[in-house]
A protein has these predicted regions:
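Short, acidic loop-to-helix structural element flanking the phosphoryl-transfer center
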Residues: 14-34, 94-99, 151-153, 177-190
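Active-site phosphate-binding/coordination module
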Residues: 20-114
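The start of beta-strands in P-loop NTPase/AAA+ ATPase cores
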Residues: 2-4, 58, 199
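Asp-based phosphoryl-transfer active-site loop
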Residues: 1-16, 183, 212
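Short hydrophobic/aromatic-enriched beta-strand-loop microsegments
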Residues: 57-63, 132-134, 218-223
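Short, structured coil segments at secondary-structure junctions
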Residues: 54-56, 63-64, 159, 214-216, ...
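Mg2+-dependent phosphoryl-transfer enzymes with acidic/Ser/Thr/Gly-rich catalytic loops
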Residues: 19, 169-261
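Conserved acidic, metal-coordinating active-site core of Asp-based
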Residues: 105-200, 206, 214
Length: 261
């Protein structure tokens, strides 16, 4: 049984947040009931919207490995916290802990401006998201996205939280948050209920390194600059295309055409 763990932005989604080039491959994966698990910096509400659009209803990993959301009854036992329709395993910290520290630093004169300091309209302007999508992006539970900062303030934040420099913005999340750890937890659950599990992981940047190192077959899609990110990951396959085009090409090679023995 294959399990696919995938990043979203610039991997399964293109620069315009579309998955059109992977649509047919997604349809084929759903037909053969292969789990597709999102593992992204995106929030629960953002991922729920994408899952609904794609018709994917498997577990998902939010906010850079801060938490795992598992639909209730999906596994026999998870020991997760029951929250609404999910069993939730929290690895990171609550947003309020991060915001409290950011506000303390702001009061001391450090420049740190994040999503919680901005309106959805302002977030939409700097990200290219729609107003509705910006509202979903702002509705964070375990992390904060920093738009503007000074280096001294960032160094202060690093003492208490993980600080990840992304392609455009800074992501701040709890010390326990870890994409790789989240993937290993979910893989263990699958192995308890299924035989011969093979894990596939797809990403596009160095922030996906923990994801790629936690799977049997790591796949790096090409960046939209025409280059691959430089990653030291064993047996890393470099997909020829960028974004969902590269995603679809790799899945055809390794999953739908039986490339993995």
């Amino acid at each position: 049984m294959y399990i696919i763990f995938t990043d979203l932005d610039n991997t399964l989604l293109d620069k315009e947040y579309s998955y059109r080039e992977a649509k047919e491959v997604l349809r084929e994966l759903k037909e053969v009931k292969i789990p597709i698990i999102f593992c992204s910096a995106k929030t629960r509400r953002e991922q729920e919207k994408i899952r609904e659009e794609m018709g994917i209803y498997h577990p998902f990993i939010v906010e850079d490995g801060s938490a795992i959301y598992i639909p209730r009854g999906y596994f026999k036992e998870t020991k997760g916290q029951p929250i609404n329709d999910y069993e939730v395993i929290i690895l990171g910290t609550k947003l309020e802990n991060i915001i409290k520290e950011i506000q303390n630093l702001q009061k001391k004169g450090y420049k740190i401006i994040g999503y919680q300091d901005m309106t959805p309209e302002e977030i939409a302007q700097v990200t290219g998201l729609s107003i509705h999508e910006a509202k979903l992006a702002k509705d964070r539970e375990f992390s904060e996205t920093i738009i503007e900062y000074d280096n001294r303030g960032l160094e202060k934040l690093k003492r208490k939280f993980n600080v990840e420099i992304g392609g455009r913005f800074i992501h701040v999340f709890g010390k326990g948050a870890d994409k790789g750890k989240a993937i290993k937890i979910l893989t263990r659950f699958y192995k308890e209920e299924h035989e011969k599990i093979k894990t596939i992981g797809l990403g596009d940047s160095y922030t996906d390194k923990p994801l790629l190192k936690a799977v049997d077959t790591p796949i790096l899609v090409k960046g939209y600059n025409g280059k691959w990110a430089e990653l030291d990951v064993k047996n890393l396959y470099h997909a020829k295309g960028a974004g969902p085009k590269g995603w679809a090409e790799a899945i055809k090679k390794f999953v739908l055409k039986g490339g993995i023995k």
